[in-house]
Each structure stands twice: as structure tokens, then as C-alpha cells.
Amino acid sequence: MKILRKNHPLLKIVNHSFIDLPTPSNISSWWNFGSLLGACLMIQILTGLFLAMHYTSDTTTAFSSVAHICRDVNYGWLIRYLHANGASMFFICLFIHVGRGIYYGSYALSETWNIGIILFLTTMATAFVGYVLPWGQMSFWGATVITNLLSAIPYIGSTLVEWIWGGFSVDKATLTRFFAFHFILPFIIAALALVHLLFLHETGSNNPSGLNSDSDKIPFHPYYTIKDLLGIFLLLMALMILALFFPDLLGDPDNYTPANPLNTPAHIXPXXXXXFAYAILRSIPNKLGGVLALILSILILATFPLLNTSKQHGLIXRPVTQTIYWIFIANLLVLTWIGGQPVEYPFTMIGQIASISYFTIIIILMPLSNTIENNIIKL
């Protein structure tokens, strides 16, 4: 068997990626989230496949087909709630994974980092088109509001929006194409994840110390396969608790009302996962400015390798940048909270302050703290 896994053309790839892969001996549980994201993706593809067997992407029957899945299909309610809450768990793991990358300086592996940003954007797009499918009030109005943002693009905006809608409003054509996108995108994510892994294995994993770990590597199996399995077990436990005890905790009650183009909900809040980006969008009064800020809030992650001037790798022994990092995380949580609040006096102001802080911390404060720490080292 040992010879087979090292010589067989297919098994050799698996062997180099998951069995004999040289891995730093000191990577902590923060490194588990990559495998957890893989597990989430598999759960989403499997539950999604079973949902797609019973779902109909037609405006007249979409809402009732989801109700039919929950009421009449064997364990349909479980599959539906695992899929909906699985998406939330996916994003929680994704945010922690990116946060770990920033904290430990994993952005130094620029190819892996950039593919990661593309994966992040693709996942957000998948979640958005998926949110439209149940065809409830929030699905319909969320689709209308978010697709309408493209009309802010000069000259081609209005044409582009109508092209995406397939008509003059969000209707049957929109729902059908969104279902098609929602079906194909997870497979594109899976392919991109393989490219992400390919680039990672070219350089090897980073580690908490930020030092070169070539002198102290251990095989991935059995050490990290067991560690990853424990992480996956805990993830499944959390997902089951969420899906069985609090299935609607992260959803919106408005989505239990069928879509009605004549009745607008009191306030349109996106899915909990994209709330921070939505808060940044809303904090700018100008439409085009808001759209640009929304896109930049994600793309700004690509500046981390460029703006990093520190002589040390990661934040493990950098107290100034560590403090700024945790302020940044707190700021992100504030933005997430604001994204789900109505557009009223205290919330709009808090949102604007938090949005300015978000960009200021990344573009100004972090590079500044790098310079300060470099000068302290010289003393």
C-alpha cells in the first residue's frame, strides 16, 4: 500500500497533499479552519443537491416548493436548515480563516492569499444568489436592492441591471438564472480551493512563530488528520445545535412571507454574513461611492502584502500592531451589527464612523505601527 500511494499517478497527488505533506509541528487550532471550510463546502454541496431535487425555480412555485420540502419531503426540514445554517457556519469559518491569515502574516504567501480573496468574493456571490431562491419578501427585495447597485456604473449601469434581471424588474427570468448560478458556483469554489491548496503546498504552511519551520516538519497524517477530524466533529456539533434548536436565529422573519413586489419590508437587511459590507455601502450617501466602498471593503485585503513593511513575520511579538488588530476586529463586529439595523439617527452615524475606521486602520494605522516597531527594534 505504501508503494502504491507513492507511485500511483492519482494516489500520488493525494499522498503529497494529505498524507506525506511536510507540515510545521507547531501549528495551532487556528490552522483548522481551512479543513473546516472544506467540510462546510462538502456539506453545502450535498444538502444543496438534495434540495435542488425538490426545488422549482419558478416565481409562482418557488416559495411553495420550499414549504413542500419542509413539510412533505423525508427530513426535508433538516436538509433545508442544515443548508441555510451551514452557509452561516461557512462564513464564520471564512472570517476566522482570513483573520488568522492577517494575524499570523499568512498574506506573505501572496499567490495563496490572492486566490483566497477570489474565493471569498465567489462565496459571497454564491450566498447572495442562494438567498434569493426561497422567494420570500427579503429574497425579492434583497435581489432588487443589490442588483440595482450596478445602475451606479456610468453609461452602462441601467443596461447592465436589465441584462442581469432578464427584464425590467426582478422576475421569473432572474430567479431561473440565479438558481443556475447557485448550482454552478460551488463547483467553481471547489476548483478554486484546489488551486488555493496547490499554491499553499508550493511554499508550505506558515506557523504561529512566524519563523522558518523547514528544520521541524512532521507528516500531515496521522497528526493533523486527527486534529482536523476533531475540528470537523465540533463544527458538525455546532451546526446540528444551530439547525435543530435555533434554525431561524440567523434568518429573517420577512422571508416567511411570499415575495410581493407591491409591498416593501420596513428595512432591507442582507444575510448576517454580508452585513459588514452592507453597512459600509449604506454609510456613504452617494450611490456610486457606496458601491465602490463595498467592493473596496473586500479588495483592500489584497493590499496587505503590499503595505506590510514589518521586519517581523506575524503579530506574535508586536504589541502595537496587535492592539490595532483587535480594534479592527471590534470595529468589524460593530459594522456587522450596524448592517442589520434600520437607517436611523444613531445607527447611521455609528456606521459612518466604523466605515472610516475600517479603511483608516488598514491603510494608515497598520503600516504606521509597522514603522514604529521597526524603529523600536533598531534602538
UniProtKB/Swiss-Prot annotation:
Record key words, sorted: Electron transport, Heme, Iron, Membrane, Metal-binding, Mitochondrion, Mitochondrion inner membrane, Respiratory chain, Transmembrane, Transmembrane helix, Transport, Ubiquinone
Cofactor(s) annotated in UniProt: heme b
Cofactor remark: Binds 2 heme b groups non-covalently.
GO molecular function: metal ion binding; ubiquinol-cytochrome-c reductase activity
Mitochondrion recorded as keyword: yes
GO-annotated cellular components: mitochondrial inner membrane; respiratory chain complex III
Major location category of this protein: mitochondrion
Database matches in InterPro entries: Cyt_b/b6_C, Cyt_b/b6_C_sf, Cyt_b/b6_N, Cytb/b6-like_sf, Cytochrome_b, Cytochrome_b_C_euk/bac, Cytochrome_b_N_euk/bac, Di-haem_cyt_TM
Keyword hit for Isomerase: no
Binding-site residues for heme b b566, renumbered to this chain: 97, 196
Binding site for a ubiquinone: 201
CDD domains the record matches: cytochrome_b_C (cd00290), Cytochrome_b_N (cd00284)
Any one of the GO BP annotations: mitochondrial electron transport, ubiquinol to cytochrome c
Transmembrane segments: 33-53, 77-98, 113-133, 178-198, 226-246, 288-308, 320-340, 347-367
UniProt subcellular location: Mitochondrion inner membrane
Binding site for heme b b562: 83, 182
Domain of life of the organism encoding this protein: Eukaryota
Misc remark: Heme 1 (or BL or b562) is low-potential and absorbs at about 562 nm, and heme 2 (or BH or b566) is high-potential and absorbs at about 566 nm.
Family that this chain belongs to: Belongs to the cytochrome b family.
General function of this protein: Component of the ubiquinol-cytochrome c reductase complex (complex III or cytochrome b-c1 complex) that is part of the mitochondrial respiratory chain. The b-c1 complex mediates electron transfer from ubiquinol to cytochrome c. Contributes to the generation of a proton gradient across the mitochondrial membrane that is then used for ATP synthesis.
Assembly with partners or alone: The cytochrome bc1 complex contains 11 subunits: 3 respiratory subunits (MT-CYB, CYC1 and UQCRFS1), 2 core proteins (UQCRC1 and UQCRC2) and 6 low-molecular weight proteins (UQCRH/QCR6, UQCRB/QCR7, UQCRQ/QCR8, UQCR10/QCR9, UQCR11/QCR10 and a cleavage product of UQCRFS1). This cytochrome bc1 complex then forms a dimer.
Full protein name: Cytochrome b
Organism of derivation: Akodon mimus
Organism phylogeny: Eukaryota, Metazoa, Chordata, Craniata, Vertebrata
